[in-house]
Swiss-Prot record:
Keyword tags: Phosphoprotein
Entry annotated with the keyword Phosphoprotein: yes
Entry protein name: NudC domain-containing protein 3
The UniProt record lists the keyword NAD: no
Pfam families from the UniProt entry: CS, Nudc_N
Lineage of the species this protein comes from: Eukaryota, Metazoa, Chordata, Craniata, Vertebrata
Name of the gene this protein is made from: NUDCD3
Sites of Phosphoserine modification: S146, S340, S355
């Protein structure tokens, strides 16, 4: 499975998890499905067995998958720890810079130096000392000018505060990491995601909104309106014109008490939306996952997938695949037929080399 492909099924799995309410029952559902619908629990005891796993192989497979994601979880823990340490280090550095800048502002300005020039002359037989004192005014002005030139820099240094990261993610890579915005986006008052046939919109509500009668949802083929009922009227949470048509008959909504209004919109056509509402910032649909979910596969496509799965197991065990078995069955019917030159001989499938393209299913 390609990296990120498992996220395709998040919406379906989240629905199961919300229904059963806990991880233990969720795992029971998953393994119960494997028990009822697959050969996961069937053991290969004889060489003639065509389905199942060797003893212990299924358990080893589960353990291997568990260890894979356990390793990823430990890596995530380490990454979070490093990010926290880096955040603390940066905060300490910023605080140190702020303290230094504040201390620089409080340093006393040095007293202007007075320059005294002594001129000695011999006049009338005596020595006369003339003291010329340079007026302190210009010096003071220069000193103040120097201070005024430096002060803005010091204030700017003290005012340098790290910018807060934006509250909402802005790039599609961030949206893809969140199941609620997978193939969609996070907006100010709602979050939306989509697959090949449906869209899911989550509109947050206050914690005290726990009953369906406390909200109002109006859906038409081209618009949506979600409001919360209050004592003095309605408070609109989301309203606008849809960018594409929806099928209102198969669209529905529900309330997750104290969390959000969950609206499932059924697309009229099988194409990807770049926005829910007109005027909304569009997403880049070239950066979303356009693979179809298994939930959207019809019966005919499902039969093909089942056959491919069967062929995969057969190939691993060195046994005939579905196209070979079909030809073997036809050959075996005519092997002992009246007039057949092979009548009475043992039928050996190994005598035939059958290419997959030679068989029509």
């Amino acid at each position: 499975m390609e990296p990120g492909a498992a996220e395709l099924y998040d919406q379906a799995l989240l629905g199961i998890l919300q229904h059963v309410g806990n991880v233990q029952d969720f795992l029971r559902v998953l393994f119960g499905f494997l028990y009822r619908k697959t050969d996961f629990y069937r053991l290969l005891r004889h060489p003639s067995d065509r389905m199942g796993f060797p003893p212990g192989a299924a358990q080893a497979l589960v353990l291997q998958v568990f260890k894979t994601f356990d390793h990823m979880a430990r890596q995530d823990d380490e990454k979070r720890r490093q990010e926290l340490e880096e955040k603390i280090r940066r905060k300490e550095e910023e605080e140190a810079k702020t303290v230094s800048a504040a201390a620089a502002e409080k340093e006393p300005v040095p007293v202007p130096v007075q320059e005294i020039e002594i001129d000695s002359t011999t006049e009338l037989g005596g020595r006369q000392e003339v003291e010329k004192v340079q007026p302190p005014g210009p010096v003071k002005e220069m000193a103040h000018g120097s201070l005024e030139a430096e002060a803005p820099g010091a204030v700017a240094g003290a005012a340098e505060v790290p910018r807060e990261p934006p509250v909402l993610p802005r790039i599609q890579e961030q949206f893809q990491k969140n199941p609620d915005s997978y193939n969609g986006a996070v907006r100010e008052n709602y979050t939306w995601s989509q697959d090949y046939t449906d869209l899911e919109v989550r509109v947050p509500v206050p914690k005290h909104v726990v009953k369906g009668k406390q909200v109002s949802v109006a859906l038409s083929s081209s618009s949506i309106r979600v409001a919360m009922l209050e004592e003095n009227g309605e408070r609109v949470l989301m309203e606008g014109k849809l960018t594409h048509k929806i099928n209102t008959e198969s669209s529905l909504w529900s309330l997750e008490p104290g969390k959000c209004v969950l609206v499932n919109l059924s697309k009229v056509g099988e194409y990807w939306w770049n926005a829910i509402l007109e005027g909304e910032e569009p997403i880049d649909i070239d950066k979303i996952n356009k693979e179809r979910s298994m939930a959207t596969v019809d019966e005919e496509e499902q039969a093909v997938l089942d056959r491919l799965t069967f062929d995969y197991h057969q190939k691993l065990q060195g046994k005939p695949q579905s196209h070979e078995l079909k030809v073997h069955e036809m050959l075996k019917k005519g092997w002992d037929a009246e007039g057949s030159p092979f009548r009475g001989q043992r039928f050996d499938p190994a005598m035939f080399n059958i290419s997959p393209g030679a068989v029509q299913f």
